[in-house]
Amino acid sequence: MDNRPIGLLDSGVGGLTVARELLRQLPNEEIVYIGDTRRAPYGPRSREQIIAFTWDMVNFLLSKDVKMIVMACNTATAMALEIVKEKLDIPVIGVILPGASSAIQKTKTNKIGVIATQASIRSDEYHKTIARKSSAVEVYSLACPKFVSIVESNEMESEIARKVVSESLVPLIGKVDTLILGCTHYPLLRSLIQETMGKEVRLIDSGAEAVRDISVLLNYFSINGQERQPLEHRFYTTAGVNSFREIAEKWLNIGQLQIEHTEIENFNKEK
């Protein structure tokens, strides 16, 4: 047993979709969450910037004595997961492999779509991961850079969101039977995405799929949390505490959240 918290990192509020599923599936686990909202979105950034920003978040979480780090951000996973895993002696998990594996299991036509940030699409990590597991699958990748901004500005239910989603997804309509939401912000637009793609298309939430792997790792390393009350979940953001709180409280549907502003730039530097 290990009652230390699990650390989650994201470029903003998107990783809350992973946090929600983690809290639902693993009720004995405390979490520490860092959202780098000030420097979001990560999608247009260079690989070097994304790696540096990810290290800032990793080192911040290490300062909170976490027992595991979840890269609840597809862009960070694509660019920095293997680099970080090599340097740390605690488990580190990303969201790409779980999402890809689930999509392969669910597709009936072997035609899978991936929507993600520009950086994730450029990295081609989803395509490469799927190809390693199944040579029969065709992958259709599409960058949807406007989606993150809509979520970060809390406009998920606006007419602007509906218009942007419907126009952005046109290249994939009718081509795939399974669609990976390859950015943890995107499940916050799930209803609009489903409406646009059609009810017959299966949507894969990569973050939610990752929680199943988190549970496996907790058991494997014997670091599960004990049943206890109360649990102290802590959330940190580098900008916009009020908007972060509004989205977090609505999405997580739990009482008073402990949310603080923090600075992480060049935090403790890379080891």
UniProtKB/Swiss-Prot annotation:
It catalyses: L-glutamate = D-glutamate. Keywords: Cell shape, Cell wall biogenesis/degradation, Isomerase, Peptidoglycan synthesis. InterPro entries: Asp/Glu/hydantoin_racemase (IPR015942), Asp/Glu_race (IPR001920), Asp/Glu_racemase_AS_1 (IPR018187), Asp/Glu_racemase_AS_2 (IPR033134), Glu_race (IPR004391). One of its GO terms (biological process) is peptidoglycan biosynthetic process. The keyword Isomerase applies. Provides the (R)-glutamate required for cell wall biosynthesis. This is Glutamate racemase. It comes from Lactococcus lactis subsp. lactis (strain IL1403) (Streptococcus lactis). The gene is murI.
